[in-house]
Amino acid sequence: MAVRLRVKEVAREKGISMGKLHRAADVSYKTIKRIYSDPFYATTTITLGKLAKVLGVPPGDLIEEVPDSKEESNQ
């Protein structure tokens, strides 16, 4: 299983822009941009916690498990 970040989707649902998210969470704009462009980006739990707090969701709502491409090809 791989873990995919759902930050972009949750922020859109909440109507929060990348700029507002980076300022409110005190996370660099570069990191937010990377998370938005690469949902498999390996960020820290501290960053996820900050983003979750600003978005008003538990940190677990910002991630989801998806099958690895290797697992898909073996089935």
Language-model-derived ranges and their functions:
Residues 6, 17, 44-47, 58:
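Residues that mark the N-terminal boundary/hinge immediately upstream of a DNA-recognition element
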Residues 39-53:
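Short, basic-rich loop-to-helix N-cap that marks the start of a DNA-contacting helix
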Residues 63-75:
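Short, charged recognition helix plus adjacent turn
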Residues 11, 22, 52:
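The alpha-helix within a helix-turn-helix
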